[in-house]
């Protein structure tokens, strides 16, 4: 055999070494910064920005979070007093010079101890008395009257801006990020906008609301204050994690979102907004009250990770950072400054419902950050228009290009053979080779990672809780290795120069289908979460079009056939009439048949093997990529150095450098957009299984994003060297073993178990429960000393399991043992009186309840059957918030529970209730034994939530002390302790 020639080294050619190096370096260069941005926060400025004091802010956060301060705790009152003092100090410091410069910038503080509201939602009724703190910094263009003091008077002007944070925490968390950082940011905003030179044009209302953690009560009751008529836009600062970056969670429209673009470190994606619209995210923030019920237009900025510390004792200043505080504060200042300086009338217009503010309507928004430093925002209808355009123009362009290629006789795709002018022979083109590779390779690789997702969800479903990057590594290494291995096998068996163009064509077809789906959602539901698909489709279209344009560099098929035929004729002459290279009809037919196979054709067909004339020793050398062969030539003849390996001879004229352009059109933008989206979603959901969410969802999401990120390698991966895929195979084996056998929790990534103690005040029965995921909740319950020897009952509770046991640890929620005071008998903890009233309209049953509890300001009435109406004495109602169920009397959709919250400790509530007559709904057949009167049964319950002093709730202290270090205890309900008495009326 003659020596195979090599060509000159070309670092940009479509050969194995350049492809491996370029693709690897680009992916590393893009993914590494994305991971850094996800976990490394911007540094705090060395000197204070004008109008701010960062050290003061950090010290305020430490002061705010020195204890648990839920609404139903004495500590909450202390926090409220501290806030009023801090607000007064800030305003007093800046007041003198501010008033001298601009009298219009006066600041007003409203200590709201008057507002209350009754709301009904589903089977739950809530009466709440607010203790909000509202600070109004009058804008230079605001109404100069004190209009809020005149009943029925509304402000004039363009509307103001609301910034909100809630100062209550849960009963088991210090509230550093939920919502301490938001509260401290609000204090600094007051400082900033009362500093001379920063006076707002529009009025600024800063709301410190109390009672968010249980039913968003503080935001609802804010609607009853006159100042709530002023703002048309809002910024809600929240925490659904315990640190990291503050994420733009959702926004109402493009016009308001553009002000977030001013943030020095923007972070977030409209994908999270779609999660709320589609109902995938079940928790809510005050945003839904301001935007949905009151008609404001605004933004929701929140911490979203780590969820393992959210609502636990690790949500404290020690586990957050000054960098997190600065990240939220800088975004709040920049966004608010833009909103209060806005001179447009974009936020004026018709109210979106009765009683809502006249803020007008905005346009749907698309928004996302780039590396945490830049922010893109544009209108949804722009995305829709571009999507429709690409859906039409893309396929049409490829079709027209294909027609032109066919007319010029350069359409080698799908070509089987072509005849020379002399009719001597049919020259094979092998134009079908590679057509079916993408469906097989893409389907196999995707199936492999999806299969891994199901495997993880089955064997070790919680491993993503602490080891999400081990899961990512497993998915990525598996996907790349399988894709490379299958591509190399296919290329080894049937080498083809059409691999790239066919794979790109399939990719564009897939992207086109995805674009159709996302475009439908954009138009029908206003869902913009598929914004990255248009970039995917556009880049893939351009790369595919380039491959089609490359075909213009090829000779006409007839010219190629004539040249091939001429070469054979000359060789016949030179060989003295030898018939070795003269294809007789039988051979020609066989040759044509052999050159038509697809990827599904048997590799053992006929007498020719799939691995014939394939030389490995040359191609394994980096320079050996230039080795090639001609078709129908003698083995001893020199091969064309411009043909890669054993690909089609006509491919010698294809450009060698265009692959880089194609890769750059697809991979970088997709890696950036999809990569950061994948990391964002992973951080948001990988610790949600403990809350009862799907165990499969995080793994399936990682599998999908792995596929989307690395699919751009498929047109090129068959030219990859074996080194990196082999290394990734080892990574896959190691991470697979780890993910299958590793324990999923640790002291830094604890699983949350939900605590509740229920006391029957009539009988003295005392039951403690932990709710969580099996088998971990069962293991934790078994470790509690007071549960030893007890019959621990574990029953399903929705998506979780409740394990409970009888306990002899009585809560000291009325009188602490260390106080020296006599303990109060249990039956005096809750007092109630139920009085039967005269029948109401339509002969409904009526009763009046009076209920109060010692050392609490939260109680509830639970009914065994639904009531149709209720009214709490002294309560306000609002048409924006339904105060009674909309139902026909006697249906099962009535109210089953009324929660009662008072700003006064030990308050007595008076509640009138109505319920349907059993007679009226059962053909006058009355089975009651009380003389024809329908009875109403249920429980009168009060709640206790203050666990700041050890020994107040001994059962909680015991659970915290004896559960394993990988367990975090949080509250299950509005109260840590529920004391109940039964009633019948």
Curated annotation (Swiss-Prot):
| Residues covered by region (Disordered) | 586-606, 614-633
Vacuolar compartment ranges equal 38-383, 460-469, 522-525, 681-696, 748-985
GO cellular component term of the entry, any: vacuolar membrane
Q: Where is the active site?
A: 212
Source domain of life: Eukaryota
Q: Which cofactor does this sequence's record say it needs?
A: Zn(2+)
Q: Where is this site: Transition state stabilizer?
A: 310
**Which residues point to the Cytoplasmic side?**
1-16, 405-438, 491-500, 547-659, 718-726
| Residues that carry a glycan | 113, 116, 791
**Assigned EC number:** 3.4.-.-
Gene Ontology molecular function: metal ion binding; metalloexopeptidase activity
Report residues binding Zn(2+) 1. 166, 178, 238
What is this protein called in UniProt? Vacuolar membrane protease
Q: Which organism is it from?
A: Talaromyces stipitatus (strain ATCC 10500 / CBS 375.48 / QM 6759 / NRRL 1006) (Penicillium stipitatum)
């Amino acid at each position: 055999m003659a020596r195979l020639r090599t060509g000159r080294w070309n670092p940009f050619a479509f050969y194995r070494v350049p492809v491996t190096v370029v693709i690897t370096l680009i992916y590393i260069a893009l993914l590494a910064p994305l991971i850094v941005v996800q976990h490394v926060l911007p540094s705090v400025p060395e000197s204070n920005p004008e109008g701010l004091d960062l050290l003061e802010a950090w010290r305020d956060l430490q002061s705010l979070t020195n204890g648990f301060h839920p609404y139903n705790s004495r500590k909450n009152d202390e926090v409220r007093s501290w806030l009023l003092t801090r607000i007064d100090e800030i305003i007093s410091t800046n007041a003198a010079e501010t008033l001298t410069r601009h009298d219009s910038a006066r600041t007003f503080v409203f200590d709201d101890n008057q507002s209350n509201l009754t709301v009904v939602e589903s089977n739950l009724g809530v009466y709440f008395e607010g203790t909000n703190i509202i600070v109004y910094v009058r804008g230079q263009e605001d109404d100069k009257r004190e209009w809020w003091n005149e009943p029925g008077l509304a402000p004039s002007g363009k509307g103001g801006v609301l910034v909100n944070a809630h100062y209550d925490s849960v009963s088991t968390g210090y509230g550093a990020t939920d919502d301490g950082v938001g509260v401290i940011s609000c204090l600094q905003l007051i400082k900033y906008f009362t500093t001379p030179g920063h006076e707002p044009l529009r009025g600024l209302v800063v709301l410190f609301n109390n009672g968010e953690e249980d039913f968003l009560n503080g935001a609802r009751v804010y609607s009853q204050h006159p100042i709530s008529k002023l703002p048309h836009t809002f910024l809600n600062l929240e925490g659904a994690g315990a640190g990291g970056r503050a994420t733009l969670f959702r926004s109402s429209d493009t016009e308001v979102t553009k002000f977030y673009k001013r943030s020095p470190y923007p972070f977030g994606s409209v994908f999270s907004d779609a999660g709320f619209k589609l109902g995938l995210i079940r928790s809510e923030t005050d945003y839904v009250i301001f935007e949905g019920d009151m008609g404001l237009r605004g933004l929701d900025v929140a911490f979203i990770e780590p969820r393992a510390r959210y609502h636990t004792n690790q949500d404290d200043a020690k586990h957050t950072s000054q960098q997190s505080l600065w990240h939220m504060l800088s975004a709040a200042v920049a966004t608010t400054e833009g909103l209060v300086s806005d001179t447009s009338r974009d936020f004026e217009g018709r109210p979106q419902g009765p009683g809502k503010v006249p803020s007008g309507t905005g346009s749907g928004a698309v928004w996302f950050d780039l590396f945490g430093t830049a922010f893109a925002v544009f209108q949804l209808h722009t995305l829709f228009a571009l999507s429709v355009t690409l859906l039409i123009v893309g396929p049409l362009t490829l079709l027209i290009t294909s027609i032109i290629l066919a007319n010029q006789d350069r359409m080698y795709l799908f070509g089987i053979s072509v005849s020379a002018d002399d009719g001597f022979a049919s020259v094979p083109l092998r134009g079908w080779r590679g057509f079916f590779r993408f469906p097989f390779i893409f389907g196999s690789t995707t199936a492999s990672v999806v299969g891994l997702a199901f495997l993880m969800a089955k064997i070790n479903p919680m491993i993503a809780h602490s080891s999400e990057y081990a899961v990512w590594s497993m998915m990525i290494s598996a996907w790349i290795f399988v894709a490379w291995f299958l591509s190399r096998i296919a290329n080894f068996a049937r080498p083809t120069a059409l691999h790239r163009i066919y794979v790109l064509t399939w990719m564009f077809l897939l992207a086109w289908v995805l674009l159709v789906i996302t475009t439908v959602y954009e138009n029908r539901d206003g869902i913009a979460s598929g914004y990255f698909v248009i970039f995917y489709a556009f880049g893939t279209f351009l790369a595919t079009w380039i491959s089609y344009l490359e075909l213009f560099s090829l000779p006409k098929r007839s010219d190629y056939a004539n040249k091939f035929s001429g070469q054979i004729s000359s060789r016949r002459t030179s060989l003295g009439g030898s018939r070795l290279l003269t294809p007789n009809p039988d051979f020609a037919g066989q040759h044509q048949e052999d050159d038509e196979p697809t990827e599904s054709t048997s590799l053992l067909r006929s007498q020719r093997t799939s691995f014939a004339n394939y030389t490995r020793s040359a191609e394994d050398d980096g320079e050996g990529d230039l080795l090639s062969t001609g078709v129908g030539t003698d083995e001893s003849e020199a091969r064309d150095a411009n043909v890669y390996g054993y690909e089609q001879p006509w491919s010698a004229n294809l450009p060698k450098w265009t692959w880089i352009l194609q890769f750059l059109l697809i991979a970088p933008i997709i890696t950036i957009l999809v990569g950061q989206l994948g990391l964002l979603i992973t951080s948001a959901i990988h610790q949600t299984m403990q809350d009862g969410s799907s165990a499969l969802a995080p793994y399936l999401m990682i599998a999908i994003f792995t596929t989307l990120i690395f699919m751009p390698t498929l047109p090129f991966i068959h030219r990859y060297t074996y080194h990196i895929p082999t290394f990734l195979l080892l990574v896959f084996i190691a991470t697979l073993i780890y993910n299958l056998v590793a324990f999923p929790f640790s002291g830094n990534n604890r699983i949350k178990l939900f605590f509740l103690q229920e006391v029957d005040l009539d009988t003295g029965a005392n039951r403690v429960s932990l709710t969580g995921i099996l088998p971990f909740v069962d293991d934790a319950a078994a470790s509690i000393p007071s549960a030893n020897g007890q019959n621990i009952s574990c029953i399903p509770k929705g998506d979780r399991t409740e394990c409970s046991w009888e306990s002899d640890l009585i809560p000291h929620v009325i009188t602490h043992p260390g106080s020296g005071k006599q303990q109060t008998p249990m039956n005096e903890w809750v007092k109630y009186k139920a009085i039967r009233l005269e029948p109401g309209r339509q002969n409904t049953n009526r009763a009046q309840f009076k209920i109060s509890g010692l050392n609490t300001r939260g109680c509830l009435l639970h009914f065994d059957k639904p009531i149709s109406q209720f009214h709490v004495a002294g309560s306000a109602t609002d048409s924006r918030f339904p105060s009674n169920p909309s139902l026909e009397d006697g249906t099962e959709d009535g109210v089953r529970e009324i929660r009662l919250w008072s700003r006064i400790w030990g308050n007595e509530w008076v509640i009138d209730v109505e319920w349907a007559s059993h007679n009226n709904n059962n053909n006058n057949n009355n089975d009651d034994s009380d003389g024809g009167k329908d009875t109403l049964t249920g429980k009168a319950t009060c709640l206790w939530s203050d666990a700041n002093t050890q020994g107040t709730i001994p059962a909680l202290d015991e659970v915290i002390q004896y559960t394993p270090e990988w367990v975090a205890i949080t509250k299950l309900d509005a109260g840590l302790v529920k004391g109940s008495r039964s009633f019948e009326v």
